[in-house]
UniProtKB/Swiss-Prot annotation:
Protein family membership: Belongs to the NPY family.
InterPro entries named in the record: Pancreatic_hormone-like (IPR001955), Pancreatic_hormone-like_CS (IPR020392)
Keywords, alphabetical: Amidation, Hormone, Secreted
GO terms, molecular function: neuropeptide hormone activity; neuropeptide Y receptor binding
Principal cellular location given in the protein's record: secreted
Example GO BP: neuropeptide signaling pathway
One family name in Pfam for this protein: Hormone_3
Biological source species: Oncorhynchus kisutch
Signal peptide bounds: none
Name under which the protein is recorded: Peptide YY-like
Compartments where found: Secreted
């Protein structure tokens, strides 16, 4: 499995949060695609 993205935390700037959520969505898609 690819590594899970690091949570930037509550105090992260909006750009970091957006990047994190994009990476997280991509990560979840990769994992769910591999499972089926």
């Amino acid at each position: 499995y690819p590594p899970k993205p690091e949570n930037p935390g509550e105090d992260a700037p909006p750009e970091e949060l957006a990047k994190y959520y994009t990476a997280l969505r991509h990560y979840i898609n990769l994992i769910t695609r591999q499972r089926y």
